[in-house]
Swiss-Prot record:
Belongs to the UPF0060 family. This is UPF0060 membrane protein ACIAD1364. Its main location: membrane. The keyword Cell membrane applies. It is a multi-pass membrane protein. The chain crosses the membrane at residues 24-44, 50-70, 79-99. InterPro entries: UPF0060 (IPR003844). The keyword Metal-binding does not apply. GO terms for cellular component: plasma membrane. Pfam families: UPF0060. Signal peptide: none annotated. It comes from the Bacteria.
Amino acid sequence: MTALAEILGCYFPYLILKEGKTHWLWLPAIISLAVFVWLLTLHPAASGRIYAAYGGIYIFTALMWLRFIDQVTLTRWDIWGGTVVLLGAALIILQPQGLLK
């Protein structure tokens, strides 16, 4: 949910600036980014650990966006890179003093 809010918050300005879409898209962009920031504050763990674990989730979500929204076939490098970062995020999340207590 957090990654989707961030991606949407960045995608709407992309549509405005690169594809000439309506400036009304700034409104959902601002709302999406505000939701993104709010969601990051909900977890009691240290902020650096949250951002590190979230990075892996964000990359996975961005790759899914690339595949299903942008309709670009993932390369083996995309898949392997996504796997590596998800494993790294899992190590951070599942450590004894990690995000899941």
